[in-house]
Amino acid sequence: AKNISMHYMSFDTQEFISKENYDKVMTRGIPKVGDVVFTTEAPLGNVCRIPQFDTDFYIGQRIITMQTKLLNPVYLEYALSSDDFKRKLVGKSSGSTVTGIRSKLLGKLTIPVPSKGLQNQFAAFVERVDQQKQTVQQSLEKLELMKKALMQEYFG
């Protein structure tokens, strides 16, 4: 669960298990690129889509792979991160030291389900915004390098 942040999966820290153990524990299906994963505790409610990755990986005990057969995965990811869903999630969670939710209770929480066409429009919009954010981020990084070069030139 520590690798899943809101809308982002980090591969900075990785733990490895043997192929034999992987085959034993992954009896409920292998996660695929684009699947939506959700943390059920520590931290509660982080959600992201699985990015392109070069190897199989294990989904830990506090992570659920959400079914997306009827929903656009991008739409599902953002619906699960909405303020409305978070309020419902916190209302059904339990635990004094570590807050979490059981999968049966999670399955009873609802999200709005617009037509597939509207879900796809939303997903296309999110993709465009993400591309624009990436372009802006690259520009900021380039400007930062230029600033450092000028500072080096002026101040040695």
Which residues does each predicted region cover?
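Short, solvent-exposed loop/turn positions at domain surfaces
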Residues: 24-25, 95, 134
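A short glycine-rich beta-alpha junction/loop motif
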Residues: 3, 40, 56-64, 74, ...
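Amphipathic alpha-helical coiled-coil/heptad-repeat segments
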Residues: 108-156
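Short, Lys/Arg- and Gly-enriched loop/turn segments at beta-strand edges
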Residues: 44-51
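Sequence-specific dsDNA recognition surfaces
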Residues: 2-33
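Ligand-binding loop in jelly-roll beta-barrel domains
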Residues: 53, 68-73
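Glycine- and charge-enriched low-complexity intrinsically disordered segments
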Residues: 74-84, 91
